[in-house]
């Protein structure tokens, strides 16, 4: 079991499906306390849809729901999962036609695992086939809160694509307001919606709501502070922005993206130039292959008129 517990905290890859199957195994063998211990280590905000829904089921003692969608003893279910993994691989390579082909085979063998249809919806969305997306989304019902929220988010994104951000935000707002005691992950998603639509004041309010619920040294808190700090920065409230970003770095001083964001903000304001350059160099050392950070350090040298160094990165 320690192997699966380590997977939960592994930041190098997505092992969420393995953890789901482990939970399924534990519940099938009536090891409910072990299953509870596993989900205690899962954070809703950083988890995938499948793991968030699994954690919710266990938190609500809905253990039977696991067996309703998958059984390790059913050969069709096992082959279906193998086909789903192939489909997921093709999707990651933007080969949506082959991805959907294997997904259809997977769904044929195990139609109970309707959550897998979220990948079909994503494939069709990326191909701008919004009518097909809408039909698939109808499979996700209110009782499965995270997949239902995925449905609402995707419907809002379609409205944004077909109309505009304003109507998309109105839609997601109206649906969110009908949710009783929304999970912290749902609040986080809503805050990100606001930030992406440049509704920074609303985003800040929601991020603040989340921050107040998190432990002081949580890495998730660092991420939310980063997002709120970025919202303040976009509004021109640099004092609040710096406060949040520095707080985030006290929690996680090796986060290259926070270092990069704060340093570049300072350089643009002609503020703490030497310290900003040091932070950018640290960010580059941490993520030397990241195009975003390479571009930032190149422009930073350009801003301080060190054109020879800038040319190495730009």
Residue ranges and their predicted role:
Residues 4-5, 39, 103, 137, ...:
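Hydrophobic/aromatic packing residues within the alpha-helices of TPR/SEL1-like helical repeat arrays
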Residues 12-13, 47, 111, 145-146, ...:
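Short coil turns that delineate tetratricopeptide repeat
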Residues 18, 51-52, 116, 150-151, ...:
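TPR alpha-solenoid repeat register
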Residues 24, 88, 122, 157, ...:
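Residue-level recognition of tetratricopeptide repeat
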Residues 29, 93, 127, 162, ...:
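Structural motif corresponding to the intra-repeat A-B loop/turn of tetratricopeptide repeats
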Residues 67-82, 215-222:
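TPR-adjacent "capping" and linker segments in tetratricopeptide-repeat scaffold/adaptor proteins
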């Amino acid at each position: 079991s320690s192997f699966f517990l380590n997977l939960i905290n592994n930041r190098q890859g997505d092992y969420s499906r393995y953890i789901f199957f482990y939970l399924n195994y534990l519940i099938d063998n009536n090891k409910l306390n072990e299953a509870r211990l596993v989900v205690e280590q899962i954070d809703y905000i950083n988890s995938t849809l499948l793991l968030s829904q699994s954690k919710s089921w266990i938190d609500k003692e809905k253990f039977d729901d696991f067996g309703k969608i998958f059984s390790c003893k059913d050969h069709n279910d096992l082959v279906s999962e193998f086909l789903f993994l192939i489909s997921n691989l093709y999707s990651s390579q933007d080969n949506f036609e082959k991805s959907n082909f294997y997904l259809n085979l997977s769904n044929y063998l195990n139609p109970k695992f309707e959550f897998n249809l979220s990948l079909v919806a994503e494939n069709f969305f990326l191909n701008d086939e919004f009518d097909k997306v809408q039909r698939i989304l109808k499979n996700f019902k209110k009782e499965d809160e995270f997949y239902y929220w995925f449905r609402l988010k995707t419907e809002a994104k379609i409205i944004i694509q077909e109309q505009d951000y304003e109507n998309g935000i109105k839609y997601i707002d109206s649906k969110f307001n009908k949710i009783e005691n929304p999970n912290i992950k749902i609040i986080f998603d809503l805050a990100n919606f606001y930030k992406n639509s440049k509704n920074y004041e609303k985003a800040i309010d929601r991020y603040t709501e989340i921050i107040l619920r998190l432990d002081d040294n949580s890495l998730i808190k660092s991420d939310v502070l980063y997002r709120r700090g970025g919202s303040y920065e976009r509004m021109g409230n640099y004092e609040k922005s710096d406060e949040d970003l520095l707080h985030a770095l006290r929690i996680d001083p090796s986060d290259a993206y926070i270092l990069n964001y704060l340093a570049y903000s300072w350089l643009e304001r002609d503020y703490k130039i030497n310290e900003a350059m040091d932070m950018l160099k640290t960010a580059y050392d941490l993520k030397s292959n990241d195009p975003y950070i390479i571009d930032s350090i190149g422009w930073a040298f350009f801003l301080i008129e060190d054109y020879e160094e800038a040319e190495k990165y730009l």
